[in-house]
Amino acid sequence: MFCVQCEQTIRTPAGNGCSYAQGMCGKTAETSDLQDLLIATLQGLSAWAVKAREYGIINHDVDSFAPRAFFSTLTNVNFDSPRIVGYAREAIALREALKAQCLAVDANARVDNPMADLQLMSDDLGELQRQAAEFTPNKDKAAIGENILGLRLLCLYGLKGAAAYMEHAHVLGQYDNDIYAQYHKIMAWLGTWPADMNALLECSMEIGQMNFKVMSILDAGETGKYGHPTPTQVNVKATAGKCILISGHDLKDLYNLLEQTEGTGVNVYTHGEMLPAHGYPELRKFKHLVGNYGSGWQNQQVEFARFPGPIVMTSNCIIDPTVGAYDDRIWTRSIVGWPGVRHLDGEDFSAVIAQAQQMAGFPYSEIPHLITVGFGRQTLLGAADTLIDLVSREKLRHIFLLGGCDGARGERHYFTDFATSVPDDCLILTLACGKYRFNKLEFGDIEGLPRLVDAGQCNDAYSAIILAVTLAEKLGCGVNDLPLSLVLSWFEQKAIVILLTLLSLGVKNIVTGPTAPGFLTPDLLAVLNEKFGLRSITTVEEDMKQLLSA
């Protein structure tokens, strides 16, 4: 086992990365190794997808499957080894079908890629784990060095984050052939074990640029189906009655659940990154979408244990449900998996609803506590002139984009302290689950404009980027000249690709924490600092002083 893709990876003087019987996320060595094997099969599939496009062949089954299966290897998504192997077998079957299509056009069709003809050597998980050793990401570290390995992983993990957003967009009916062609090209190239530093740096920026397009179609999918989010108050306390909790990012799953629970007497609560759903008109119209439950994903083992109903996980993040003994009432959807937990293959939630009706639910309603969400792209752009006016009248000094992933490290209290230290004449724009560090606190307003503005999920960084570009255009300056600072928390691969997106767009002087990614060496961090001004957090006082004086 070697895995260094998330923030909680083991760090030692000898090197970074989980390499024992189990990773810090709870992923076993078996599952981790089989995920490496799956990725290798997906690289072979992408190699043939690139070749097929040379013949004008576009296989939509391949295009929809490849990013989805890659997504299953993202942190805290799928811990179920047999399902990982199932994805690998499906990848090979699709590859062989695509290969046959190519050979039908050109009998001499060949692909020069070491993964192009990979076969699974056994049906036994132990044997497959031994085969997977050929594809462990650091297998040639001694030959290439830590810097090349770090850049490879930056590209691989960034592309994995983009694949997750591609799957979210695909579920909503969004497809862009150029994006998929680019994805396959990069995925196939990474399967050749590239070792050129400049090429890898260029690839990381290409991934960021591609992801901007992915976020654009995801935004179109969400707003096209569910309307543009508008500011909405959400209750974060319990309402009496039977209940279901839904977590993750998949708004379509939430919509289907709301439709199927309507009139059943079962209330629905959002959790984690599903919180922004309350801002969408076509979702909040369901009166039994009664509120948001819990806090950051890392607290789920305590909070889910207390929730008196079933729980549905639509995407990341899931952690061991046996710890809180709720594994008999947590359900996984799509690419999510945990051994022994019931999985919903389709969009029928009747079994979950039946379980909710058999449980007690909340016995009474708590005193409501309302927070505001729903500052989507359209709302943000509508406020652009107001923001400019406030700046011109010196009522608004600075905007801080304070968002990203949450996690368990104690150092993450930095983000709470930073938020509460932001001066009264400054505004906080937030997104992703890092907001749970401060989104239930009161921040007041500036002439009626809330000082805490929740822009949505991690992918809604797109909205923040569009706002920044719009403000810069109206003010006749560059984005980096705005009174705007980005203070981002990271945990997994979606955050990595958001960072690459921002860097590829030329955004500079981003501050990140609580730690640097374990796969980025001091040399690579120095390059990113020199080229983009990217740096790690220090103290709230020092960072606030520096950012306000910039």
From Swiss-Prot:
Q: What is its EC number?
A: 1.7.99.1
**Listed GO biological process terms:** response to hydrogen peroxide
Any idea which positions bind hybrid [4Fe-2O-2S] cluster?
249, 273, 317, 405, 433, 458, 492, 494
* Keyword list, A-Z: 2Fe-2S, Cytoplasm, Iron, Iron-sulfur, Metal-binding, Oxidoreductase
The record's catalysed reaction(s) read: A + NH4(+) + H2O = hydroxylamine + AH2 + H(+)
Looking up CDD domains in the UniProt record yields: HCP
Record's cofactor remark: Binds 1 [2Fe-2S] cluster. Binds 1 hybrid [4Fe-2O-2S] cluster.
Principal place where this protein is found? Answer: cytoplasm
Instruction: Please list the GO terms describing molecular function.
Output: 2 iron, 2 sulfur cluster binding; hydroxylamine reductase activity; metal ion binding; peroxidase activity
Q: Does the keyword Cytoplasm apply?
A: yes
* Function field: Catalyzes the reduction of hydroxylamine to form NH(3) and H(2)O.
Give the protein name, as stated in the record.
Hydroxylamine reductase
| Source organism of the structure | Escherichia coli O6:K15:H31 (strain 536 / UPEC)
